Amino acid sequence: MTQAVMLQGTASDVGKSVLVAGLCRIFYQDGLRTAPFKSQNMALNSGITPDGKEMGRAQIFQAEAAGITPDVRMNPVLLKPTSDRQAQVVLMGKVATNMDAVSYHDYKPRLREQILAVYNSLAQEYDVIVLEGAGSPAEINLRDRDIVNMGMAEMAQCPVILVADIDRGGVFAAIYGTLALLHKQERDRVKGVIINKFRGDVALLYSGIEQIESLTGVPVLGVMPWLDVDLEDEDGVALQNDKYRGNAPRDITIAIVQLPHISNFTDFNALAAQPDVRIRYIRRPEALTDADLVILPGSKNTLSDLAWLRESGMADAVLQTHRQGVPVMGICGGYQMLGDTIVDEVESGLGTQPGLGLLNTITRFAQDKTTTQVNATMSGELPGWLAAAAGLPVRGYEIHMGETVLQEGCCTAMTLQKNGCSVADGAVTADGLAFGTYLHGLFDSDAFTRAVVNGLRARKGLAPWETTFCYAEHKARQFDLLAEAMRQHIDIDKIYTIMQQHQEPV
């Protein structure tokens, strides 16, 4: 008999993903085999499972919180927006097609049977499934074909807890309005409310909580304070909310260009956790002035974002910063942009386009997507700020549709081990001031990260830090801190009771 509970939100970015991770950690600490599940995730932050399947980063870090290996069944449908109207549809970890919103809405009913089968297969292996909704269940225009909120709760026959964000204001209206827009059978499935991201004296909420409970008949299970925990965000909404502006003074400042279609910005969480590093996401040319390193991150639409770089003045600013001796790094789409030429006869149909010209490379887009976890070794000789990283082992994952070929003047940055073969990856110039790679997650390799940060310190005349920061241990501490706070501020016993009362045979 598998127990399950689903967290749905009054809106996007109310904190569902983090609270799901917290519940996964709590149940894991309590000795229960626990798995996260989100039937459909729309995000540009994705990762790769050990068997080469692509899934949302949120479910990956939730699986880590539960102490298990990420499994693509935890996120069977992943939507990766390529424009305001189109998205790449990834089914069970592999690209299926590209669709516009209307076409996908019509397509969703065909996914129900597959989603339910995947969910049931997980339920047969775990004691508890913690499900996550998307956006709000009160999107009445999407209700008839819903597969991720109440539609999924109905398929799983599980109770729902509604999460509301008080930090954005209007929390009681959001709770009341959401419940009012649900059908009665949907409303009956909601067994509790969590008020999230509260700052101040909780006593000020008591009268409001009593009234909302009286009005809705749904109990408030807890009020979570605004937590200073360092955990991954699901999508770019967090970048818009100033979480990553990085105003605290640190020895090293790293500027990451916030591309319109930025993907996998979780690549930089380990960098941001370094005690001597300040990360800043920037969209204005003048914000580059104090950067010790500039990074062009991954992109879901490389040529569109390259055009934005030029139109916004960011391209000129990056090139000027490079001429002043500041290193520039590119990851995946950012690596492609740093090259001389990009040939796209697949994604945009724009043909051959010039890159920024900092690396003498040619990239050709391809139909097939590379998705794999890899171990790699940095090249034995690396110049400049990268020198201390020479020969170091690193680990990461590839998600890209294209191949990049080095021309004269570029050296290979690292060697990947793939299917028993050694494969060259990345490019670096002779002076080390331009460096690119397809490898996501590179900075999760602690020794590499400390080596390159110390290389940046040396450029400023600062002594190296001898202690290597362990990012895996840091993440584990954050999961434990989250679980501790949730036990303190949420009635976890009540959640256990809710799950037991609605326990269903699989």
Curated annotation (Swiss-Prot):
It comes from the Bacteria. InterPro entries: Class_I_gatase-like, CobQ/CobB/MinD/ParA_Nub-bd_dom, CobQ_GATase1, CobQ_N, CobQ_synth, GATase_3, P-loop_NTPase. Pathway: Cofactor biosynthesis; adenosylcobalamin biosynthesis; adenosylcobalamin from cob(II)yrinate a,c-diamide: step 3/7. PROSITE patterns: GATASE_COBBQ. Belongs to the CobB/CobQ family. CobQ subfamily. Homodimer. This is Cobyric acid synthase. The gene is cobQ.
